[in-house]
Amino acid sequence: MERLSMRIPENAAVILKGLSEAGYEAYVVGGCVRDSLLGREPKDWDITTSARPEQVKAVFAHTIDTGIEHGTVTVMIGKEGYEVTTYRIDGEYEDSRHPKEVQFTSQLLEDLKRRDFTINAMAYNPDRGIVDAFDGIGDLERKIIRCVGVPQERFDEDALRIMRAVRFSAQLGFEIDGPTKEAITEKVQQLENISAERIQMELVKILVSDHPEYMRLACDLGITAVVLPEYDRIRGVSQHTPNHIYDVEEHTLRAMMNIVPDKVLRLTMLMHDFGKPDVKKVVEDGREIFYKHPEVSAAYAEKIMRRLKFDNDTRTKVVRLVKWHGLKYDASEVSVRRALNRVGQDIFEDFIKVQHADIEAKNPAVIPGKLALLAEKEKTYHKVIAEGQCFTVRQLAIGGLDLIRAGIEPGPLLGAVLDKLTEAVIDDQRMNNKEKLLELAEKLKDDPAVFTPKEDFFM
């Protein structure tokens, strides 16, 4: 037992003291101990105790049965809730996810034995110090992710621990130790038994960590082959073009590192070039081109995010950003207005961040020029918005009702005419006048070309 001291929240200390005075053992446990020893601010303070759930409820006035069948009761101190879980031994696991039964125990060591990694298997009590039976402190000092006990047994109990190993490695910048790595490659196929929602959560935690480039490690260990096979397809795909010196995987990893740790933005950079293997072509001078790869990548993003059960808002934003990330436009007001019309004002600033990160992962020789141009585009964007310039159908001086009154029937033609009017105003803001727009609409309604959209160009 290490006689190190830790600062714990006052309310957590109240719970430890209350259980102790009632005759029970109680410790803060797991991630909060790990983070405190690393000098990080813990997000949650979990408590483990020798008291059974009904005994915990008898000690405290306000409790919630959050997972009582697994021994967990939430103790409310004011408006703050703390999960208090009885020492337990998990029974046999039948599906790499859930134990058949949970058996309570009076021994803290038995509870710590069932935890995933040594750095998460430490407990602390102000009176007793730190309980570190598996050298978690040593592994923190060595910067090692190591399973408690036999790694294969830990992964058999819950296969998601395979992804958690990479996640903690990415969050902390730690190495995974040899036997744990070997067990991962041996047991990785068991991830097929894990729900899409749980896979999604761990994937996002890796991506928004300090080291999103550890996706390379996930691929090396065979994890992506099971949960994200689309990633494996970009490994080793060359990009012989003046804009690139890295293969698609290396470019992708660098692009993720170049953007803020935001879920939508990191997911966008992860998948922005997933379509490149499908469209790669070698032209006469030996250059490799990837025509319309953003559209193909967007289709992959849609499929992947549905498979992993992402929420609709996140999925829609990511797919749109992936689709438009390669849009070609210049710094003129007309070009920026057209880009705003295509991309959407709601995600345009994220779109600029995506293009910035993409550029910074290209050939260093082209980066300064491309960043300078992007800065000009961003400057123009702010001017267009500040001046209230028109770039959407909603900003037109006329609406659908005006066109119906002018004799255009509701239906596809009406929508096509409105789109063409919007394009006309994007090209020339002086056209945003009711009389001029009605005059143009009269010409457009009989023009077969009204249904032909303006072509967009992609990098």
Predicted regions and their residues:
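Catalytic cores of the polymerase beta-like nucleotidyltransferase superfamily
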Residues: M1-M459
